[in-house]
Swiss-Prot record:
Its main location: nucleus. Residues 223-261 form a coiled coil. One of its GO terms (biological process) is response to ionizing radiation. Pfam families: MPN_2A_DUB_like (PF21125). It comes from Danio rerio. This is BRCA1-A complex subunit Abraxas 1. A motif (pSXXF motif) lies at residues 388-391. CDD domains: Abraxas_1. The modification Phosphoserine is found at residue 388. Belongs to the FAM175 family. Abraxas subfamily. Involved in DNA damage response and double-strand break (DSB) repair. Component of the BRCA1-A complex, acting as a central scaffold protein that assembles the various components of the complex. The BRCA1-A complex specifically recognizes 'Lys-63'-linked ubiquitinated histones H2A and H2AX at DNA lesion sites. This complex also possesses deubiquitinase activity that specifically removes 'Lys-63'-linked ubiquitin on histones H2A and H2AX. The lineage of its organism: Eukaryota, Metazoa, Chordata, Craniata, Vertebrata. Component of the ARISC complex. Component of the BRCA1-A complex. Homodimer. It is found in: Nucleus.
Length: 391
């Protein structure tokens, strides 16, 4: 029984370089992939099967060469130019080309018809028939645009169709596979032991571990802890922003409904205005304090601002003002006592100038009388002097 498995292996450095180059460009990016193709054949013998052959085909991506623009090595109909590929490769050989890549924004992880035609024409020109097509599709992870997502996949031509093959990132796997970098070997040789003992103090700590590697590992753990804290904070802020955006969307939708259907949201205007509510306690208090003034118990005024006596309140509300508002009655009695002497003083003050006028008139009359009397006396004296004989 035979099995054929194909995988693509790429390092984190090359993948990050692809991402960096794509994010720094405003349009889609494409280019060539350089590397090597390795094939292995494993034969297993089990109780159920005498021979179990498994072919492992691994495509190791080592480098990528980006093109300056789209359609750099093919035409609008998908015809690939070998001369343009050599110009892009420059000092590299065609044997090192194991495929090409394309980066599209906000699209699906699926080959288009144009990409399938280009890939088929490249297989005809290049010597390596097992070409791989790598597709990278970045998109926004959240509505606010603070988190981005990058999906990548690889396709090869197999059995008259394009199939998706798995991609393995070498330094993003299980960290337990790299423990031998920090731990010394269990059975060292004699020469190795002598060399290590000679320089042990410089590179190794007391636990037979590499000092620099342990420090780097501790720093890595601290950075991971800080990154986890930042991730939690970013997640909380993202939830808050999403909630605010939902509220804003609901408000916009409500405003749009009000603009499109204003009749539904308008309050119906009644034909006749509501009658004002009567303050029965105030009406009873005014009736008690001013029983002879009915104009104070009306709520309707004329155009000129005069109360309408026909609409005054004449109903008895059966409210005892002496128990409800006892202070009003006390103030009323005290005012009556205080206002009586004030009226007398006012009358006295009002009659005082009349008396002064009368006194002034009598004085003027007496003065005029005295003046007239003195004049008559002088005249009489003059007459008596003139009639007397002169000797």
């Amino acid at each position: 029984m035979e099995e054929f498995n194909t995988t693509v292996r790429i390092s984190g450095f090359v993948l990050s370089s692809l991402m960096f180059h794509h994010l720094n460009s405003d349009a889609d990016v494409e280019g060539l992939i350089l590397g090597e193709s390795v094939g292995e054949e494993n034969c297993r013998i089990t109780d159920s099967q005498i021979d179990h052959i498994q072919f492992e085909h691994t495509l190791n991506i080592q480098k990528h060469i980006p093109c300056h623009k789209l359609h750099s090595f093919y035409s609008n109909v998908g015809d690939v130019s070998e001369q343009k590929i050599r110009q892009i490769l420059s000092d590299y050989k065609e044997e090192n080309v194991i495929g090409w890549y394309r980066q599209r924004r906000n699209t699906r992880q699926q080959m288009t018809f144009m990409e399938q035609v280009i890939h088929r024409n490249m297989r005809k020109i290049l010597s390596n028939q097992e070409l791989v097509f790598m597709l990278l599709t970045p998109s926004q992870g959240t509505a606010s645009g603070s988190t981005h997502r990058l999906e990548f996949s690889a396709f090869i031509w197999h059995s008259s169709q394009y199939i998706n093959i798995p991609i393995s990132v070498s330094n993003l796997g299980n960290l337990e596979q790299q423990d031998y970098w920090r731990v010394s070997s269990t059975c060292p040789s004699l020469g190795q032991s002598q060399a290590v003992n000679q320089h042990r103090a410089k590179f190794f700590c007391s636990g037979d571990d590499l000092r620099e590697v342990r420090n780097v590992s501790d720093m890595n753990d601290a950075l991971l802890a800080e990154m986890q804290k930042v991730c939690v904070e970013v997640e909380k802020s993202e939830r808050t922003v999403e909630k605010l955006q939902e509220d804003i969307a609901q408000l916009k939708e409500a405003i749009g409904k009000q603009k499109t259907h204003p009749e539904e949201h308008e309050t119906p205007i009644s034909a006749c205005p509501e009658e004002p509510k009567e303050n029965t306690l105030l009406c009873s208090a005014l009736r008690t304090l001013f029983p002879s003034v009915p104009s104070l118990r009306t709520q309707t005024l004329t155009v000129h601002g005069f109360p309408v006596l026909q609409l005054c309140c004449n109903t008895d509300h059966n409210i005892d003002i002496s128990t409800k508002l006892p202070q009003i009655l006390e103030n009323q009695h005290s005012r009556r006592k205080v206002t009586a002497p004030r009226l007398r003083k006012k009358c006295l003050v009002a009659s005082f100038p009349q008396r002064l006028k009368r006194k002034r008139k009598t004085r003027e009359v007496s003065e005029s009388a005295s003046e007239s009397g003195s004049d008559t006396e002088i005249e009489m004296n003059g007459q008596s002097g003139s009639n007397s004989p002169v000797f």
